């Protein structure tokens, strides 16, 4: 019997040593992702639709695209907050600052937190300032971008240091909920993030699949004490930024942030074994399809578009 280790086995070896994900990122699971005709077909449709959106964007012009994206984000706020935000298509940074400076209001705090995340994605993608981490410490830099404008309760919390305590995901507040998932042990975080970087650079997987699987793996690792959701979604948006464009990326942020319960349900199906990576990718790519449909609606305001 041959004892030669294949390239595929070598790429998967690290993942199979990761507690909590060894059942997900197996050689067989990654092979199924590569060979899934339904995923390949769905991605081909996504890219074709994106090309049509790009054609409309070019006719619309960058400033008008900025204006339309900002208006889309403003409309996510409640009416009182929306009236306080001015559209500044020439200055995405000023727009983000205005969203972050909305005065504290406990009744709209959760909605504002979600809209701040979308506004951050908009500002970074509009400025071409969002890229994938190049090393493990790059995840800390990504955290800083993902948490820009979020309240800091003290000098120590929240911050971009990797957590040094055990963490779990629960289905309700502490002492009232059930444990859904035990996150990676603190001692494993550096090694597992390095393995995540390997996944994100695996050219045998389509970029969209790398982006979505990278998000799932990041959620399993949960390397920070706070802001993991913001950072994980930002990571996925960064990975998609090489193939998709501002309106789609902003609308995808809306889909995954405003409808994050749906994404969470997909993660739970992975946890329980009721779904596999193919199912997870298909579900998240369906959200990307929805984002493209919303982007098309936004761009129609500047002219007619057919998809």
Residue map of PLM features:
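FIC/Doc superfamily catalytic core
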Residues: 1-307
């Amino acid at each position: 019997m041959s004892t030669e280790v294949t390239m595929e086995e070598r790429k998967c070896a690290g993942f199979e040593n990761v507690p909590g994900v060894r059942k997900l990122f197996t050689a067989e699971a990654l092979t199924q992702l590569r060979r899934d005709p339904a995923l390949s077909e769905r991605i081909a449709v996504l890219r074709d639709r994106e090309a049509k959106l790009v054609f409309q964007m070019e006719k619309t012009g960058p400033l008008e695209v900025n204006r339309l994206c900002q208006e889309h984000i403003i409309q996510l706020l409640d009416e009182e907050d929306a009236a306080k935000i001015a559209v500044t298509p020439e200055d995405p940074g000023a727009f983000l600052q205005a969203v972050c400076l909305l005065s504290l209001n406990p009744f709209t705090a959760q909605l504002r937190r979600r809209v701040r995340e979308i506004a951050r994605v908009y500002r970074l993608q509009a400025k071409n300032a969002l890229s994938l981490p190049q090393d493990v410490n790059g995840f800390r830099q990504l955290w800083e971008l993902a948490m820009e404008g979020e309240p800091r309760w003290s000098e120590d919390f929240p911050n971009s240091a990797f957590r040094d305590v055990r963490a779990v995901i629960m289905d309700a507040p502490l002492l009232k909920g059930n444990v859904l998932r035990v996150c990676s042990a603190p001692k494993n975080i550096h090694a597992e993030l390095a393995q995540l970087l390997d996944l994100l650079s695996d050219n045998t997987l389509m970029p969209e699949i790398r982006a979505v699987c990278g998000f799932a793996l990041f959620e399993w690792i949960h390397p920070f004490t706070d802001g993991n959701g913001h950072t994980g979604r930002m990571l996925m948006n960064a990975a998609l930024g090489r193939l998709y464009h501002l309106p789609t990326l902003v609308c995808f942020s809306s889909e995954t942030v405003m409808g994050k319960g749906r994404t969470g349900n997909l993660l739970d199906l992975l946890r329980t074994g009721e779904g596999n990576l193919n199912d997870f990718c298909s579900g998240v790519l369906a959200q990307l399809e929805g984002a493209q449909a919303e982007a098309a609606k936004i761009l129609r305001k500047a002219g007619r578009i057919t998809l």
